[in-house]
Regions:
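Outer-membrane beta-barrel pore domains
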Residues: 44-48, 52, 58-200
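Short, small-residue-enriched loops and turns at beta-alpha junctions
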Residues: 19-21, 52-55
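Aromatic- and glycine-enriched pocket-lining scaffold segments that form the walls
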Residues: 1-43, 47
Length: 200
């Protein structure tokens, strides 16, 4: 960690690989983080990742390049905003050539706090992965995955150690990426999810 100024911090990481604890190959990966706090209400963060993703389960994978940029505004206030964009490129060996396989995402989240225990958040998002690097469609006849989503989430804080969430989320796409309640291909899906998080 290196402080570049009173508002700017730089981090560098040596990693085993992409979101993994066990190293799948002999090479290491490199990550960087630049954190900028212009004032007490805003945080702007930029991350990068470069690493060799070849392994026994994905022998054609080569270098992966990834970057994301996110902004957090007024996280402890009555109304807060979080927004993020990211993009990646997975190099793959096909014959004697290396191909570029891109994916990207953008989202915007707003949260309104009624009091210390109750808040409502809304989210809109778009995700595109034309070459199935991160995700594949449930429908085996569809190649690539591109979809948008929007949702509302009610957050109920239970004392200081637990958070209960009720989340409704709609997904839509131009292709039949999803499966409906009749087990048929569909261009949309609706999720209703609840969960509880406990910390100590």
């Amino acid at each position: 960690t290196t402080p570049l100024s009173s508002k700017l911090l730089f981090y560098i990481y040596i990693l085993n690989g992409w979101q993994q604890i066990h190293d799948n190959n002999s090479g290491k990966a490199l990550g960087t983080q630049l954190e900028y706090r212009p004032d007490n209400l805003n945080l702007i963060n930029w991350n990068t990742y470069i690493g060799d993703e070849s392994s026994s389960s994905a022998p054609d994978n080569r270098m992966r390049y990834f970057t994301d940029l996110y902004w957090v505004h007024n996280p402890d206030g009555v109304f807060s905003i979080t927004s993020c964009v990211y993009a990646g490129n997975q190099k793959r060996k096909q014959g004697n050539e290396l191909t570029n396989n891109y994916w990207w995402q953008a989202n915007f989240i707003g949260r309104y706090s009624f009091n210390e225990s109750l808040s409502l958040s809304g989210r809109v998002e778009y995700f595109s992965d034309a070459n199935n690097v991160q995700i594949s469609a449930i429908n085996p006849n569809i190649s690539g995955f591109s979809a948008f989503s929007g949702g509302l989430c009610l957050n109920v804080k239970i004392k200081k150690q637990a958070l209960l969430r009720f989340d409704g989320r709609y997904f839509g796409a131009k292709d039949n990426l999803f499966i409906d309640k009749n087990n048929l291909p569909s261009k949309s899906a609706l999720w209703l999810v609840s969960n509880m998080t406990v910390w100590f």
